Amino acid sequence: MNYKQACIKRNIELCILFPFVLLGKILGHFIKPRQQASIFLFFPSADIGGSPKVNATILHLLKDRKPLVIFSKKPSNNGFKELFDSANCTIIDLHKLIDNKYYHFINVIYRGIISSWINKSPKAVVMGGECIYFYKIIPHLKSSVKKIELSHLNTWLDYNQAFIKYIDYRITSTPNLVRNFQIQYKNNQVPEKYLSRLSYIDNWVDIPPYKEKKASTLNVLFVGRGAAQKRVHIISAIAEQLMRANPAITFTFVGDVASFLSPYVLSNATYLEFVNDKDKLYDLYDQADILLLTSAFEGLPIVIMDMMARGKVVVSTAVDGIPDYIEHLKTGLLIKEIKNEQIIQENGVELIEMLFNDRALLYKIGLEARITALQKFDRNIFEEKYKALFS
């Protein structure tokens, strides 16, 4: 679907749903939010993941201004609930009302209710962190409301192009995604005036003191969700091949990925479904030598940043934003094949065996990765840029 078609589809939907939205706006005068706010943050849920972690980081950055957080999607695990709750801000979880296809009209009515809250708020600022409901709300907001979109993946491009004209700032977490937007704008004949609204802000991570790890074994770590894009079954195949051949190579899996692991890997690797304790998770990072990812698509996972900050070597498929930060044989190792799973498996095995046999290279790449993290993942720059957006 091109830009013009997306806009036509959007306008038809807005016309059809107008009576329900209008009803919601009327109800919004009687249904009051639990807290008056000038900042409204739309997030899908508090599930574990890189994107929700960034959302929580932004919430904590703004907590003194008491933003209102709206969750719209049924959570899978709510693993970051405590992280969001610890900001001591008002959170309205609407998923039981608006994430149900059997009474979708309530979803539409709430667009009117919430937009009326926002439109009545002086100097309102609205941000959507990969949240579909954000796009449903913004056509109903006054032009004076500042609207900010945060994206980490290019999987949203076809959907959100219909809402380009409503968004004042389109923020991505990698330069690659900005390039994706620019290509889309050109191919779909999006007016050039909207290009100036694109920019990226690198996420930040803590840079802990460097700990040199000396051991005869080599520990390979995977951290992530059990999502299809992660292709954990490939990592399982790599792990089984390496562990059967060399007992000194060990694997640790963190995430809800048991169903993707072979019986051999489940029996012989370390497996932890969830690690909510941040210190325990960081201990696992420190104990590892390598982070292995074989994703089909990614933005820049926070775990990559965390591992680079610790001087660990990232071995990953060269997808999307990752090559902007991982330079092969300098700051990490890239698997250039991204489609043929057998070749990905073979390359992954070869690269890990190479690092096992060449500890000097492992050490050298790890130090270069840490230097890159120090340069790019700066907390002060992150905070200054986001505070400026919400000013």
Where are these regions (language model features)?
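A conserved mid-protein helix/loop that constitutes part of the nucleotide-sugar donor-binding site
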Residues: 50-57, 227-241
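Nucleotide-activated donor-binding/catalytic signature segment of Leloir-type glycosyltransferases, i.e.
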Residues: 91, 260-279
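Aromatic "clamp/platform" in nucleotide-sugar-dependent glycosyltransferases that forms part
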Residues: 296
